[in-house]
Swiss-Prot record:
Residues 1-56 form a transit peptide. GO terms for biological process: photorespiration; reductive pentose-phosphate cycle. Belongs to the RuBisCO small chain family. This protein is coded by one member of a small multigene family. The basic functional RuBisCO is composed of a large chain homodimer in a 'head-to-tail' conformation. In form I RuBisCO this homodimer is arranged in a barrel-like tetramer with the small subunits forming a tetrameric 'cap' on each end of the 'barrel'. SMART domains: RuBisCO_small. This is Ribulose bisphosphate carboxylase small subunit, chloroplastic 6. RuBisCO catalyzes two reactions: the carboxylation of D-ribulose 1,5-bisphosphate, the primary event in carbon dioxide fixation, as well as the oxidative fragmentation of the pentose substrate. Both reactions occur simultaneously and in competition at the same active site. Although the small subunit is not catalytic it is essential for maximal activity. It comes from the Eukaryota.
Length: 177
């Protein structure tokens, strides 16, 4: 047994000559003189991209007082006709309309500092999802009913794709005054 261990260690200890011609040694970086100059000699700024006069008409969203809610929240409140067009779009894509409502229209945390179930991301569903709905007036009628029942709550319409199991669209249909 000892002789077999000696033979195996002797075979491992044998080292061949090092091959130095495999990789060329590092000689440092090349001189920058060999590279062509790509800089302009003058400081001509006329070729730089610019949004020019459009800067004066841009506005910044004020961080206080105007909260952004969902899709289309930067627009004025949607009229009944505008809501009907959005719901028609939702129905044309074969999405299931759902109506939800909440006292707070944005994500908030009052129970814990980390995100969880009760942080305002989940709204209460108004009745059941409207499977089989084919007319926008049915959805608008349900929104009006939710507004009458809860006038101080936000009401939103979501479009749910039951084939992919995802929410595809969501927008505020009613904001309390």
């Amino acid at each position: 047994m000892a002789s077999s261990m000696m033979a195996s260690t002797a075979a491992v200890a044998r080292v061949g000559p090092a091959q130095t011609n495999m990789v060329a040694p590092f000689n440092g970086l090349r001189s920058s003189v060999a590279f062509p100059a790509t800089r302009k000699a003058n400081n001509d700024l006329s070729t730089l991209p610019s949004n020019g006069g459009r800067v004066s008409c841009m506005q910044v969203w004020p961080p206080e007082g105007l909260k952004k809610f969902e899709t289309l929240s930067y627009l004025p409140p949607l009229s009944v006709e505008d809501l009907a067009k959005e719901v028609d779009y939702l129905l044309r894509n074969d999405w299931v309309p759902c109506i939800e409502f909440s006292k707070e229209g944005f994500v908030y945390r009052e129970n814990h500092a980390s995100p969880g179930y009760y942080d305002g991301r989940y709204w209460t569903m108004w009745k059941l999802p409207m499977f089989g709905c084919t007319d926008a007036s049915q959805v608008i009628a349900e929104v009006e009913e939710a507004k009458k029942a809860y006038p101080e709550y936000f009401v939103r319409i979501i479009g749910f794709d039951n084939k992919r199991q995802v929410q595809c669209i969501s927008f505020i249909a009613y904001k309390p005054t």
